[in-house]
Amino acid sequence: MILNITAYFIIPVYTFLFAWGTDLFRLNFSVLGSLANRKNAFLLWGIIVGIYVLRKIIHHLPRNRKETVTSVSALILLAFAVTTPYLPENRPFRAFLHVIFAFSASVLLLACLYLIVWKLYCMNREVYRPYFICLNIITVLSAMLLCLAGIVSSALEIFFTVSCTLMLIRLYRRVTSSRDGYYSLKHKV
């Protein structure tokens, strides 16, 4: 129940509200998070997304060492990104680090999702094909938004966050459903 509320309501609404009233194609969460009135909101957004995506969902999906290292690295980089201020005029090196942390966290999350979905797809192509296609669509549309704006924009960050969250809750429900043997085999005593 709490996973559904978080996935279908809290993360999408909070993500949209965080960027509300701003130019979605000229600004990004880094710029918004550096504003005094949005600093705590940015930190809270990072905590919600980090805990939900990387701990509650990916933790329960099939993974081996590669996926574990990738997801933990993404979580650490996300934590670094939301706690490293993006102030290019005052602190250019920290701003540079912030960009590296944020971008790397997203790339590692995407890589982790591909590793997990690919593993499931190889186990049962018919069942997990929609998730593999969905992940490819998320990747292509994210690349298109990046090219359209020329920067990692709020529009891209909103799309990526919400679409990955919604895909993950559906994948999580599929993997943990009784119709799929993976979860029951994994958690047998």
Indicate residue ranges for each PLM-predicted region.
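Terminal transmembrane helical module of multi-pass membrane proteins
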Residues: 122-189
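Membrane-proximal helix-loop-helix units in multi-pass membrane proteins
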Residues: 76-132
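Hydrophobic alpha-helical transmembrane segments and adjacent interfacial helices
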Residues: 12-16, 54-57, 75-89, 111-115, ...
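Hydrophobic cores of alpha-helical transmembrane segments in multi-pass inner/ER membrane proteins
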Residues: 8-14, 41-56, 105-116, 160-175
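Physicochemical signature of membrane-embedded alpha-helices that form the seven-helix bundle of GPCRs
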Residues: 3, 7, 45, 73, ...
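N-terminal topogenic module of multi-pass integral membrane proteins
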Residues: 1-61
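Non-cytosolic membrane-interface motifs at loop->transmembrane helix junctions
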Residues: 30-34, 91-105, 153-163
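Membrane-interfacial loop-to-transmembrane alpha-helix junctions, especially the N-terminal start
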Residues: 1-7, 63-74, 124-135
